[in-house]
Amino acid sequence: MRRIPPLLALLAATLLLMSVAFADGRPTVFYDSHSYDVMGRDLIETVQDWPASNHNKYERHLKMSDWPVPSDRLTDPQTEGARSPFYGVLLHGAYLFTTIWGLAALQSFLAAWVIYLLWRTMAPRAPSWSYLAMIAVAAVGTSISFYTTFAMPDIFAGIGGAAVVLILAQGDRLKKLEIAGLWAVCAYAMVIHKSHWATELLLAFAGGLLLWIVGLSTQSVVRRVVLVVSAAVVAWAAGAVFDQIYQNRTGYRLGHPPFITARVLADGPGEAYMRQACAQTAQGGAQPYVLCKFQTNVGHSTKVKVSGELISNLILWSDKKTLGVFNLASRPQRVGLESEEMRFVVGTVKFDPLGTLGASLWDWGQELVAYQVDDPLRNPSAYLRGHYWPTTMLPKLIPNFQACRPPGDCRPPFNDMVLADWHGVVLVVSLLLLVWRMSLKDVRQSLWRRGLKTGEDPARVGASVLLLVGVLVLNAAVCGILSGPFARYQSRLIWLLPISLGLVASALPMRIKGLAPWIKRRWDGVSDLWERARAQPVIGRFLPPLGGHFMRFCCVGGLGFIVDFGVLTTIVDLGVNKIAARLLSFSVAVVATWLVNRVWTFRDYDGPKRSLAREFGSYLSVQSVGFAANFAVYTAVIYAAPVHNEHLQLLLGSLAGTAAGLVINYLGAKHLVFRRGVRAS
């Protein structure tokens, strides 16, 4: 079969990655899109070398409740250091010469191109349709198309990370012009956001070490790592030069909000340290931190019943006089909050090192599994309400914004919770299949014998996939620990996981027929370890046989939980009351577990026959007693647990309820429903 011409394949992939915008009728924007646009215009004016006297049109405001004059140029230099002018140039250029449809097309094309290079270098003999099929699955089954058409720099987290992987693992299969283009993508991704800079730089060093371990020559590793590091240096230098020019022209120094301060305060150790430090010096002498002036507000914010990442948002951005810190501070106080940030964070770590470490690891873990699309699903009408946002660039950036102006409504045609369920299924299946394929003999042995020395395809593919997964892990660490476990930070690049599976499927035979034997081998390994544990004199007496009825009953209970939770979340997403939804999901799970228990768990309990109706009635009665305990615990958890993520709330409630009813259900099933000598006809 002849290959589709690369340009035609890229154009088709670009259109597929814009599918969400086509369905919505417009690309999406965010509050920060305005700030990026303002900074982009300032960079353009800097290049044009406009006289400094023209810069009195930059009306500086100190807090969102105090705007001097409505203007689309409102900005505060103490916050705009976190908004890159280099992405702003791209955004404003799209606005000037096309619309943000042009920006969406460019971002989609760049994503399609980087994925194409991954596919071509990892699977050089694969048919062209496999590339388009992979893109199509990603477009409808992952978050990628929500971020390629989002007027924010988030998509470059994934594009930049993938570009680093290409340079490190596939550099010998790339043309010089392609390497130059990937280097430019890396540098651009780094200069537009500090989290991209940190993630890509960490990936360069960690990836270089991994590639050296699996056989790549030291010279090749050093050359490729240096190439990525040079992009990081150029990105840092470009940002520093602009900051200095900006200060010279305007008299203001670009700063950034104290994100890490807000993070350690929201996590808990920071607040405890703040109270101790401020109390010790309040008795005599100056207070050690500007933050001490706001410690009452911090205390009020941390007591608000919202998730941790939202607490840090309250500390930074709330306008309420009893909650906010940064947004209520004067300009000198904002400068002070920024300058004392590292000193405060170091003081917090010294004050409670274990608490800070534990909170950071928890934030990392939360970020790692935060895959839900949220900000790109905002209703554009939100940017057209009030007296401030309609004066910014946002109405001009939103295509056909008149249709969204209140009382109009142009919310995206996607249910966020249904979308989260769908993306979650795709991610779980992708992860399981990826782990299975990477653990097979060809990849495992090729990596073990340092197959990159001889250019073995399984080693090359395995190393590339490990690096792509490494992008996800490092991004979660950087964003979760330094800013907070916000869903957008991870969902913007979680699509790398299904893409990795698509690349593996294109490059290596999937051998689906070998999946069942592989599962059996893993089960045999677990069984062997379990029996060894049972042979130990101390713990063995507490462990039932792995193949016994209780363990099989637990496996069926796991299946029942999946059915229960799957039905529960689906119908809750459709608007059904949580209590009524649980009754329905329980009923479906009872039927499913009864069928599996009778044909597998208790299949050896045979005897005089009785009707299926009587057997099911007995099973339902036992399950109802277990469900009473299950339901009581579930209700207590969803209404009393300090968890504000609805899916996590449902998950914890279902897990706790299932555990509570397990023993009752097992004893009843064994001794009443499937007791020896009783079998249904």
What is each PLM-predicted segment?
Residues 93-107, 359-468:
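Membrane-interface anchor segments at the N-terminal boundary of transmembrane helices
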Residues 76-113, 147:
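Loop-to-helix entry region of an early transmembrane alpha helix in multi-pass inner-membrane enzymes
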Residues 26-52, 228-339, 357:
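Juxtamembrane membrane-water interface segments immediately following transmembrane helices
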Residues 25-39, 47-71, 77-90:
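Extracytoplasmic catalytic/substrate-binding loops of multi-pass membrane glycan-assembly enzymes
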Residues 101-126, 140, 159, 163:
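Transmembrane-helix motifs of polytopic, lipid-linked glycan transferases
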Residues 146-156:
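Short acidic/glycine- and proline-prone juxtamembrane loop motifs at membrane-interface regions
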Residues 179-194, 231-236:
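Membrane-interface alpha helices of multi-pass inner-membrane proteins
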Residues 164-180, 211-215:
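Membrane-interface transmembrane helices that cradle and orient dolichyl/undecaprenyl
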